[in-house]
C-alpha cells in the first residue's frame, strides 16, 4: 500500500451508526434492557441520538426500574414511565424535518415507537435485535411500518471489534 492509498479496513456506515447506538445504550440506567437509537440524514450525518430512560424531571432514583408480572402493581414497574430510545432520539432532534432519515436501533421498535417513526418522516430503520418479534406490539409495529412504506432490515454484524477504554 502506498502512502496515497486509502485505508481498506475502515468501518462501514452501518457499523459506525450501530456502534453509536450501542454506545448510547450504555447511558441507560435500566438494569434489564439497554436500548440505543441514532437518527441519520440521507448524507450520513448524525441528527440525533437517544436511549431508554425516564423523562426529564423524573428522577431515576425515585421511579421504579422493576419489571412487572401481571398480578403485580403496574405503578411499581418501569413500563408506564420509561421513554424508549427511538422516541427520545426523535424528541431530542432540534433541527427541522426528519423526512427521509434513517434510524438505527439496537432493538426492533414497539408499536408506539413505530408510530413516532412514521409520523416523523423517517423512511428507513436498521435494527440489531428483534427478540420480541412474536409479541403483539412488534407485529403491530411491522404492520404499520409496512403500510407506511418504511423500509426496515436487520443489521449484519461483521464480527469486528473496537475497544474503547475510559
Name each region found by the language model.
Residues 1-166:
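Zinc-dependent deaminase catalytic domain
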Amino acid at each position: 500500500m502506498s502512502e496515497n492509498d486509502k485505508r481498506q479496513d475502515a468501518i462501514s456506515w452501518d457499523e459506525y451508526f450501530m456502534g453509536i447506538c450501542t454506545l448510547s445504550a450504555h447511558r441507560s440506567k435500566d438494569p434489564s434492557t439497554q436500548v440505543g437509537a441514532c437518527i441519520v440524514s440521507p448524507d450520513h450525518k448524525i441528527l440525533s441520538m437517544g436511549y431508554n430512560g425516564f423523562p426529564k424531571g423524573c428522577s431515576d432514583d425515585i421511579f421504579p426500574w422493576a419489571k412487572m408480572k401481571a398480578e403485580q402493581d403496574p405503578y411499581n414497574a418501569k413500563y408506564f414511565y420509561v421513554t424508549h430510545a427511538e422516541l427520545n432520539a426523535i424528541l431530542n432532534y432540534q433541527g427541522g424535518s426528519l423526512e427521509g432519515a434513517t434510524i438505527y436501533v439496537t432493538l426492533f421498535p414497539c408499536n408506539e415507537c413505530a408510530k413516532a417513526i412514521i409520523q416523523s418522516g423517517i423512511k428507513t430503520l436498521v435494527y440489531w435485535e428483534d427478540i420480541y418479534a412474536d409479541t403483539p406490539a412488534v407485529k403491530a409495529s411491522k404492520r404499520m411500518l409496512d403500510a407506511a412504506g418504511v423500509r426496515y432490515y436487520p443489521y449484519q454484524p461483521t464480527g469486528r471489534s473496537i475497544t474503547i477504554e475510559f
